[in-house]
Amino acid sequence: YNSDITRTYALSKLDSEVEKLWHAEKQAQQAAFDRAAIGTSCEDVDKAARDVLISHGLGPDYDLPGLPHRTGHGIGLDIHEGPYLVKGDKTPLAAGMCFSNEPMICSYGEFGVRLEDHIYMTAEGAAWFTEPAHSVDDPFGVTV
């Protein structure tokens, strides 16, 4: 089985606007997780993430700066497989499904922010395979 994770983090002090966008990305990822429930459509999970980004003045839809692609994809035998957490995918979430949860923010030529983790569906709802980023300067929660 295949998977991957992505972390955007800073080695030094960030511009305050970029740091705000990092937090918007984290909120969008959490919104997608919170919306993932048995029977919810894949596109509704995508919409939850996009709604957060819209509330931060990004997008809408696939407009930039904002989220230019899907919120997530199935994971398993292939690193990217269906179903997809994207507008138009009406597949209902079911126990046993596994997904990436990776909304990202892009402003071409300027910056990008992505936090990618994996979730799986249980009979009770979504659960994390990977632990979401802790902070912009300590992505794995291991400050030394």
Model-predicted regions and their roles:
Residues 1-144:
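Active-site neighborhoods and metal-handling regions in enzymes and metal-associated proteins
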